Amino acid sequence: MDKEVKAWLSDIERAISEIYQFLPDQNDFEAFQSDLKTKRAIERNIEIIGEAMNRILKVRPDFPIATARKIIDTRNRIIHGYDDVSDKIIWTIVVEYLSELQKEIERLQS
């Protein structure tokens, strides 16, 4: 695996780890929704994940991440359509999809 790709995978792994640090209780949507700092920190880390994934796909278009395109699209939506991203969308990404991405990243790094 390319050195750059390894670095971008590490960036994704670190961003996922930070998201889980910012949101230890994944059962309290109302607390998440009312905490602006946490929301922005998580959004920023999703942007980082999306940008790293975009860079990976530019050098390795066939890279085996099942949701790669959706991740990049979400990053673009947060950055360019920030007023169109609901708290529920961000919450759903973290609670329902992030752990699977984390497993994929760990598998690829081993």
What are these regions (language model features)?
Residues 1-110:
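Solvent-exposed interaction patches of small proteins and small membrane subunits
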